[in-house]
Amino acid sequence: MSRARVARRIAAGAAYGGGSVGLIGAATVGLVLAEVQLAKRLVGGGKAPVPPSADGRYGVAFAGPSDPLRFVLLGDSTAAGQGVRRAGQTPGALLASGLAAVAERPVDLRNVALPGARSDDLERQVSLVLADPSGVPDVCVIMIGANDVTHRMPATQSVRCLSTAVRRLRTAGAEVVVGTCPDLGTIEPVYQPLRWLARRVSRQLAAAQTIGAVEQGGRTVSLGDLLGPEFEANPRELFGPDNYHPSAEGYATASMAMLPTLCAALGLWPESDHLDGSRREGMLPVAKAASRAAREAGTEVTAARAPWALLKHRRRRRLPAHTEPVPHDDAGTDTDGGPMPGRGSGATWRRA
């Protein structure tokens, strides 16, 4: 069965309440997951530090009459920024800083991601987001899937939970970008041939996630091997000290690939009708676009006229220098939204 058909079967099972769709043999899956769990114990020692909080305001130098953009991150430890020590090195901070630079507006970041979360935790996370009295976010990023694989969550259930989360956020009025399941074959203590099998399971889930998210009005970016052959070529640099979560450089690599899609979702990125064939862009059936994106890290998939989707390889944008958040209470704005003298200095982000 082709990769596209497998992804479509999983997505269809999720949409219509079907049971689990087998990805590969159950015994093989169990062996893969046992090795991945062993790898996590070897590299993490069973104790993971709490990710630094990056909640706050970015781009305070752009304060003006417009309200700040509201940006929320949901998902698992990757979305939370597990593996780095400084808030400014987390994907939330990197994306918020980049978004502020492109929009030339402050950005308020809220991160509700939970390390260890699976897709069934998205219901709780979305409810937290929609209950926020400050209003519906302008854009949300969801990064989820690795724990679904390692804990053997049925793929149909995983995709159903993600699709529901995207639908709820889109119905409320938020734009949604999903970073799909990363490639578990890049974890160093997982060896061949299990590394190949872990990669296959991860990619099949990523493709099915793409179909589910796009059909609910979201956009996806394939994280794959966390966005590029750099990870396999330089694992010591792009993985963190635990060899399982990304390092600061790894998160920056992933964020550079996601930022253009985040900006495009908000209408801040120039959209061209031209599809660059040399970059393998094109209009494809959703399932085929999803399958291809899962194999090519950093690929964006967005809905076109059903049952088609646009597959794009946006050029990565250099991120601003690492920045730390400004707490909302100290963002240096008065009641009219203008800068307050003597406040917000030293911790605000400014253009380089």
Describe these PLM feature segments.
Residues 2-38, 253-352:
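Conserved catalytic region of serine esterases and O-acyltransferases that act on ester linkages
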Residues 34, 38-113:
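Serine-esterase "nucleophile elbow" of acetyl-processing enzymes
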Residues 81, 111-119, 146-156, 194-198:
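Surface-exposed cleft-lining segments at the edges of enzyme active sites
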Residues 120-157:
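Oxyanion-hole/transition-state-stabilizing segment in secreted/luminal serine hydrolases
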Residues 157-171, 204-211:
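Alpha-helical scaffolding segments of alpha/beta enzyme cores, especially the outer helices
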Residues 187-222:
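Substrate-gating cap/lid alpha-helix
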Residues 247:
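Short, conserved phosphate/pyrophosphate- and ester-handling motifs at nucleotide-, phospho-/glycolipid
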Residues 70, 138-141, 175:
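Structural motif
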